[in-house]
């Protein structure tokens, strides 16, 4: 005979068998509210609407069950069965897998709703998000391993418009500054004295009136851009045409190298800005270090221009003196004493990751220039060695103290054990033959006589009262 039960009734019976097979002390313990729902739906599916009287106050559990059942009203049995199965679907994932649960899953079938991606039609959301991350612009800065993409509707349009306006303003400012600097250079060339011509020399890749633009992503400057443009260039003082030509050629070559290196650095950083190919914390630390380096360069360039206007430039010869042939063989290093001291202090404050950069910059031809940075490194190594030796001595002292404390505690424990043994031996009398103490034996012998005497006194008083 074929099974003629409807599908919802078969599912309902399988769900009821699962609930009835739950152990009382099992890993899954449904709440009271959940059990009330199952009870009310079960009663409604098997007996129909509630027609019984409400239990008395002495049965609070029965009253709660009656209220839950009565709240369903005139719900049909089929709807109650379907609601029972729907409630079971909500908790079936948290229940342990048993034979009853497997039977229920086979009867219910797949009850998950598959939602397709409407935008792409195929491919999951994870792959689309991964593709958006990989194809995002390099302007999305990676912080704590999360890329902040700039493709978010109206906000991205506003940001692009603001960026275009900012670029236009920067270009106009740069054009004005270049025109102003060209006019100043012409005025300086027309003057008879050539001592103040050092103002037009490009120091650290920046002119006197230039400014530093700090972007959102500070990139590390190449070593070619950090070196001095006027280093190791012998310029005769009496020939301004040769001097300006040599300086302009060196400036042009250095600017080309600097732009190429900066483009390469930006290309590399743009490829490694995503959260997949780099460590966000290391990238964030490098960005902060490069940001501080740009600020220091800007401050130092201002100091250079002020000192160069005063004429306090230092020659490349020994002890700052000119060679024997007057102005010939004079080397413009483009550094003042104040600048060199400030630069050394800034390099010493840089983190350990900038050691290679400072080492490359320190290869100039000065006797008192950047090569003096190797001294503090040696002193730092010596200080580290001294600190390690002192730390080792302190550890040895601590170990010795711990050993002495262990020896003292062991000796104290042994002495206490010996004292307790001696006291127990002293308490026991030497010639006592019994295993119990004398006091206990005396009490065991005397107490019957005491009780007999008390009973005798009590009986005498009672007789006196009767007479």
Swiss-Prot record:
The keyword Transmembrane applies. Residues 312-322, 335-347 have a biased composition (Basic and acidic residues). GO terms for cellular component: cytoplasm; peroxisomal membrane; peroxisome. Residues 119-204, 219-240, 304-376 are annotated as: Disordered. One of its GO terms (molecular function) is fatty-acyl-CoA binding. Its main location: membrane. Residues 352-372 have a biased composition (Gly residues). Residues 125-139 have a biased composition (Polar residues). Pfam families: ACBP. Residues 170-187 have a biased composition (Acidic residues). The keyword Membrane applies. It is a single-pass membrane protein. The chain crosses the membrane at residues 439-459. CDD domains: ACBP (cd00435). GO terms for biological process: fatty acid metabolic process; pexophagy. Residues 8-97 form the ACB domain. It is found in: Peroxisome membrane. An acyl-CoA binds at residues 19-28, 39-43, 65, 84. Residues 382-411 form a coiled coil. Keywords: Autophagy, Coiled coil, Lipid-binding, Membrane, Peroxisome, Transmembrane, Transmembrane helix, Transport. Acyl-CoA binding protein which acts as the peroxisome receptor for pexophagy but is dispensable for aggrephagy and nonselective autophagy. Binds medium- and long-chain acyl-CoA esters. This is Acyl-CoA-binding domain-containing protein 5. It comes from Xenopus laevis. The lineage of its organism: Eukaryota, Metazoa, Chordata, Craniata, Vertebrata.
């Amino acid at each position: 005979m074929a099974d003629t039960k409807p599908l919802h009734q078969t599912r309902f019976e399988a769900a009821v068998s699962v609930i009835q097979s739950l152990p009382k002390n099992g890993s899954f313990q449904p709440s009271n509210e959940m059990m009330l729902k199952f009870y009310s739906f079960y009663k409604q599916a098997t007996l129909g609407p509630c027609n019984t009287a409400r239990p008395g106050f002495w049965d609070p559990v029965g009253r709660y069950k009656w209220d839950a059942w009565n709240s369903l009203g005139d719900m049909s049995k089929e709807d109650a069965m379907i609601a029972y199965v729907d409630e079971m679907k909500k908790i079936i994932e948290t229940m342990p897998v048993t034979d009853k649960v497997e039977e229920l899953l086979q009867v219910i079938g797949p009850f998950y709703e598959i939602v397709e991606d409407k935008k792409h039609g195929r491919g999951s959301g994870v792959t689309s998000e991964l593709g958006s991350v990989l194809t995002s612009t390099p302007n999305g800065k990676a912080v704590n391993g999360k890329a902040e993409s700039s493709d978010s509707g109206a906000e991205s349009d506003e940001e692009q418009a603001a960026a275009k306006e900012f670029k236009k303003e920067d270009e106009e400012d740069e054009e004005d500054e270049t025109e102003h600097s060209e006019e100043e250079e012409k005025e300086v060339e027309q003057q008879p004295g050539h001592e103040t011509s050092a103002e037009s020399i490009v120091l650290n890749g920046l002119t006197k009136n230039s400014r530093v633009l700090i972007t959102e992503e500070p990139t590390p400057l190449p070593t070619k851009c950090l070196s001095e443009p006027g280093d190791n260039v012998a310029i005769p003082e009496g020939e301004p045409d040769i001097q300006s030509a040599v300086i302009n050629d060196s400036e042009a070559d250095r600017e080309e190298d600097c732009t190429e290196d900066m483009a390469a650095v930006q290309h590399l950083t743009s490829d490694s800005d995503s959260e997949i190919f780099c460590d966000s914390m290391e990238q964030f630390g490098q960005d902060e270090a490069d940001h501080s380096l740009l600020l220091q360069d800007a401050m130092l360039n201002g100091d250079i221009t002020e000192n160069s206007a005063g004429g306090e430039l230092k020659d490349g010869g020994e002890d700052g003196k000119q060679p024997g042939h007057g102005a010939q063989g004079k080397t413009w290093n483009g550094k003042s004493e104040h600048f060199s001291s400030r630069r050394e202090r800034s390099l010493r404050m840089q983190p350990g990751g900038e050691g290679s950069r400072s080492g490359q910059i320190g290869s100039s031809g000065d006797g008192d220039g950047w090569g003096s940075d190797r001294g503090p490194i040696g002193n730092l190594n010596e200080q580290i060695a001294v600190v390690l030796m002192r730390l080792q001595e302190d550890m040895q002292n601590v170990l010795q103290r711990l050993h002495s404390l262990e020896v003292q505690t062991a000796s104290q424990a042994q002495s206490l054990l010996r004292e307790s043994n001696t006291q127990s031996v002293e308490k026991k009398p030497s010639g006592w033959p019994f295993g119990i103490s004398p006091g206990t034996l005396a009490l065991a012998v005397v107490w019957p006589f005491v009780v007999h005497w008390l009973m005798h006194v009590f009986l005498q008083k009672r007789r006196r009262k009767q007479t």
